[in-house]
């Protein structure tokens, strides 16, 4: 049986990346297009799909407000434009989604927030909470403080990192190109679009040209890098041309696109990632905690009897039973020093012991392999 392309209607958690050229044109913000996208988001949510939007456009929007000249901007100018544009971008999303009863939340991140384990855990916890509360997070690269990210325009990779961080099963890159081609279709009339990519091979990567529009900075190479990150994390990814009204509806109805097939599901990919890490310490638990962990529960401080090693928040640790038998691995939400202090205590006592409020679980079940 031939491999089937993913169906956007079946997505449980969908990340949509919106390129600058789609949001902003010579006249400013494309509000009518954004309102049409809001219809797509509202429709997806009625199907039970959780939606996260990763949006470019703050610099492109801000530079018009500040009347900056066309062409490349100095780093400081880009950061200033981002500071002005982020406010207007967040307001625009709020205005088009609010009529559908959708609450938006602005989340500003950089690639470092997903690559550093401690910050990764914090970002993940925040996003999970926002989704659980029924919001649509609007994620934007924090171009006001970022440096390399501004120079290289990496929101494609950022979107893939966000998709993996939140365990999304589908990522859609709305772009100014309608898929991945064997060559640059603007230069080679014989270039063919791939409808479905099962494996990203070196030969396929070599086909990636570097088409760059006047407003967006991400070329096809960054999209292939994003696809590699996404599919390895169990998330299917599509590249599609998004300028049409209701671009997600168009994708659903068979618009031109390239789908990159996921390697397994997001949770399994995450478990493999955690299991491959080298432990920085060991947390030994009592018999009651063993039963709770085997039943799929999180590890609470009350079940901890000993802490070994020197580890920080977000570091991988080994989880051992009363006799030292290895039960699994997980990412700890506390440092070794903090874990020693709260070991054996109820979660409600954490504030009194540490002097500040922390997570209820020492290791959350989603950050654990047993």
Curated annotation (Swiss-Prot):
Its main location: cytoplasm. It catalyses: L-glutamate + ATP = L-glutamyl 5-phosphate + ADP. Its EC number is 2.7.2.11. Pathway: Amino-acid biosynthesis; L-proline biosynthesis; L-glutamate 5-semialdehyde from L-glutamate: step 1/2. Keywords: Amino-acid biosynthesis, ATP-binding, Cytoplasm, Kinase, Nucleotide-binding, Proline biosynthesis, Transferase. It is found in: Cytoplasm. It is an enzyme of class 2 (transferase). The keyword Nucleotide-binding applies. ATP binds at residues 17, 175-176. GO terms for molecular function: ATP binding; glutamate 5-kinase activity; RNA binding. GO terms for cellular component: cytosol. It holds the Pfam family AA_kinase. The keyword Membrane does not apply. Substrate binds at residues 56, 143, 155. SMART domains: PUA. PANTHER family: GLUTAMATE 5-KINASE (PTHR43654), ISOPENTENYL PHOSPHATE KINASE (PTHR43654:SF1). HAMAP family: ProB (MF_00456). Catalyzes the transfer of a phosphate group to glutamate to form L-glutamate 5-phosphate. Belongs to the glutamate 5-kinase family. This is Glutamate 5-kinase. It comes from Cereibacter sphaeroides (strain ATCC 17023 / DSM 158 / JCM 6121 / CCUG 31486 / LMG 2827 / NBRC 12203 / NCIMB 8253 / ATH 2.4.1.).
């Amino acid at each position: 049986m031939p491999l089937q392309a993913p169906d956007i209607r079946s997505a449980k958690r969908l990340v949509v990346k919106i390129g600058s050229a789609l949001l902003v044109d010579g006249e400013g913000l494309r509000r009518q297009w954004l309102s049409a996208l809001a219809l797509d988001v509202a429709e997806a949510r009625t199907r039970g799909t959780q939606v996260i939007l990763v949006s470019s456009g703050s610099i492109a929007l801000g530079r018009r407000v500040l009347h900056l000249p066309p062409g490349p901007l100095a780093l400081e100018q880009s950061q200033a434009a981002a500071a002005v544009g982020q406010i207007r971008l967040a307001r625009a999303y709020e205005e088009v989604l609010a009529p559908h009863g959708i609450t938006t939340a602005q989340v500003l991140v950089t690639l470092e927030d997903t690559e550093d384990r401690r910050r990764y855990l914090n970002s993940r916890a925040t996003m999970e909470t926002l989704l659980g509360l029924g919001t649509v997070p609007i994620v934007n690269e924090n171009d006001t403080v970022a440096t390399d990210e501004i120079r290289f325009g990496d929101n494609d990779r950022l979107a893939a990192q966000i998709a993996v961080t939140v365990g999304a099963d589908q990522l859609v890159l709305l772009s100014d190109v309608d898929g991945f081609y064997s060559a640059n279709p603007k230069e080679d009339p014989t270039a063919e679009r791939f409808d479905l990519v099962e494996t990203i091979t070196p030969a396929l990567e070599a086909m990636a040209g570097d088409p760059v529009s006047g407003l967006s900075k991400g070329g096809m190479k960054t999209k292939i890098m994003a696809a590699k990150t996404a599919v390895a994390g169990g998330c299917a990814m599509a590249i599609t041309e998004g300028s049409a009204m209701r671009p997600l509806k168009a994708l659903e109805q068979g618009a031109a696109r390239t789908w990159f097939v996921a390697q397994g599901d997001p949770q399994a990919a995450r478990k493999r990632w955690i299991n491959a890490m080298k432990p920085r310490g060991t947390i030994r638990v009592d018999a009651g905690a063993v039963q709770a962990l085997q039943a799929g529960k999180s590890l609470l401080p009350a079940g901890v009897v000993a802490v070994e090693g020197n580890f920080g928040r977000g570091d991988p640790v080994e989880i051992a039973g009363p006799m030292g038998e290895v039960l699994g691995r997980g990412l700890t939400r506390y440092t070794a020093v903090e874990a020693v202090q709260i070991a054996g205590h109820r979660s409600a006592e954490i504030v009194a012991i540490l002097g500040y409020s922390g997570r209820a679980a020492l290791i959350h079940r989603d950050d654990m392999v047993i």
